[in-house]
């Protein structure tokens, strides 16, 4: 199922998001070994279709920002305590990945998916979810318009050819 997740991830962003680079097989194996075991299942959601294929997915992690601020940016000598405590406190979540398989895009599956994720987050005690930077030209992020939200950070990149 994990390899299927990465295949769906590559399919849902490839050619749709500017400058997207798909995971290679080697990178997928490395991510499986290093990251997948660390994720909290309560903060992840995978919707399967009737063919047992991934229709939509989402991965969130507890935010470590405040913990690293308290630790002064260092794990030692006592910063590790703040990080471990933050991993069990779900007040703030960082939304890492979200997507839908190409055949399920624009079908309303995002409404089902976001409803399930919101309920899971509330059950864990989360009050805030912070999305990672999103390209303004990515129309799929329009889903946030249905939620009470505040744009509090904007990042832009301009491209200029050097002659």
List the predicted regions and their residue ranges:
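Short conserved micro-motifs at the rims of enzyme active sites and ligand-binding pockets
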Residues: 69-71, 105-108, 142
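Conserved acetyl-CoA-binding loop of GNAT-fold acetyltransferases
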Residues: 123, 143-154
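Conserved acetyl-CoA-binding loop-helix of GNAT-fold acetyltransferases
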Residues: 78, 92-101, 105-121
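A conserved beta-strand-loop-helix scaffold within acyl/acetyltransferase catalytic domains
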Residues: 1-99
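Conserved GNAT acetyl-CoA-binding A-motif
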Residues: 91-93, 121-135
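Conserved beta-strand-loop-alpha-helix junction that forms the acyl-donor binding cleft
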Residues: 100-105, 131-141
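C-terminal "cap" of GNAT-fold acetyltransferases
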Residues: 154-163
